[in-house]
Amino acid sequence: MSGFQRIAVLGSTGSIGDSTLDVIARYPERFGVYALSAFSRMDKLAAQALATGAAVVVVPDNNAATRFRQAWSPSRALPEIRVGAQALADTAADAGCDTVMAAIVGIAGLPAALAAAQSGKRVLLANKEALVAAGSIFMSAVRQSGAELLPIDSEHNAIFQCLPQGERAGAPSTPAKTVRKLILTASGGPFRRHSPEDLQDVTPDQACAHPNWSMGRKISVDSATMLNKGLEVIEAHWLFAMPADRIEVLIHPQSVVHSLVEYDDGSVLAQMGQPDMRTPISYGLGFPERLDAGVSPLDLAKWGRLDFETPDLERFPCLRLSYEALRAGQAACVALNAANEIAVAAFLEGRLPYPWIARVIDAALEWQAGRPSVTLDHLTDVLALDAQVRAYAGNLGLA
């Protein structure tokens, strides 16, 4: 995208938002912040809006709006404060911005990400649920509007870089020619060497202690269970039109190789770099040009060795369940994600033992499989099913 970009950073107070604003600040002649959004950290949102000169902030409710005003500097004019979920979606589609960083965690980020796609924006997609829960709807919106879709997850960004995509980012309907398979790497998280028995008494702080990446608590737990990698398998299916049996996962504890693409001639292309989200973010902002993101160079001699291994599905049942959901269809993927969000929230609150996260997901998938089939042609259909699964998971007596 040439010219000055006006950017809406949705989920600006999270780790992806922080990294995005860091990259934007390096290029004031190329990028400006139009809008920011946050759910709870109004002090931080106010500081970000002051620093960037954002014209708009979006907050979840009137109470948050009051807290934002209280945190604001009296010497500066207030930005426009928009309130609620509809305001968030409207901002993503706003003519005032060209590019949307969709970095809100969970299903809550889906409507705004979809609105950005429907309005033909450059969409920097860091919200997994847009594709996991609504892949068909989302990719159809990208095709119909002509939006640019650039994946920001380090694994999908790596695959995108290794594919012959040319100068355009969109929504393919068939796999790239001559590509045999996609290989997503995973660190294995903090419990890579733990037996299933060792996981009975895992605490939230232990699960959130990721060895390589700095992330929020929910996604850190997802990384520990490898449900995060399962969601990324589903994402890869939609982003690259690749069937499940041509998407593999490799544990790579150093997180230096971010993903690989294997071609029909036996060649394997890998994208490597420091485990720093500013690299994929800068790639998305600057595409097709590469920008200096402030990331230190990769010193392979210093690393010395890189290790790879096949994931143990007994240790990581959530990865197995994710493949099962992808093969079962979109409704199962909605159930997978919704049940996981309920289970992880309960675990983080101390109400659910760590091993029961997978059990809640498994039970929800069985429940969904036993129900009449549903049509998921519209966002309202997806959100209705999501709510039903959440209610079921919350009433299991487990969450």
Curated annotation (Swiss-Prot):
Indicate which residues the UniProt annotation says bind 1-deoxy-D-xylulose 5-phosphate: 128, 154-155, 187, 210, 223, 228-229, 232
What InterPro entries does the record point to? DXP_reductoisomerase, DXP_reductoisomerase_C, DXP_reductoisomerase_N, DXPR_C, DXPR_C_sf, NAD(P)-bd_dom_sf
The entry marks the following residues as binding NADPH, namely 13-16, 127, 129, 216
Reactions catalysed according to its record: 2-C-methyl-D-erythritol 4-phosphate + NADP(+) = 1-deoxy-D-xylulose 5-phosphate + NADPH + H(+)
Some GO term, biological process aspect, for this entry: which one? isopentenyl diphosphate biosynthetic process, methylerythritol 4-phosphate pathway involved in terpenoid biosynthetic process
Known EC number(s)? 1.1.1.267
Q: Which residues bind Mn(2+)?
A: 153, 155, 232
Similarity-based family: Belongs to the DXR family.
Q: What function does this protein fulfil? A: Catalyzes the NADPH-dependent rearrangement and reduction of 1-deoxy-D-xylulose-5-phosphate (DXP) to 2-C-methyl-D-erythritol 4-phosphate (MEP).
* Alphabetized PANTHER family for the sequence: 1-DEOXY-D-XYLULOSE 5-PHOSPHATE REDUCTOISOMERASE, 1-DEOXY-D-XYLULOSE 5-PHOSPHATE REDUCTOISOMERASE, CHLOROPLASTIC
- Would you tell me the protein name for this molecule? 1-deoxy-D-xylulose 5-phosphate reductoisomerase
Q: To which species is this protein native?
A: Bordetella avium (strain 197N)
Which taxonomic lineage does the organism of this UniProt entry have?
Bacteria, Pseudomonadati, Pseudomonadota, Betaproteobacteria, Burkholderiales
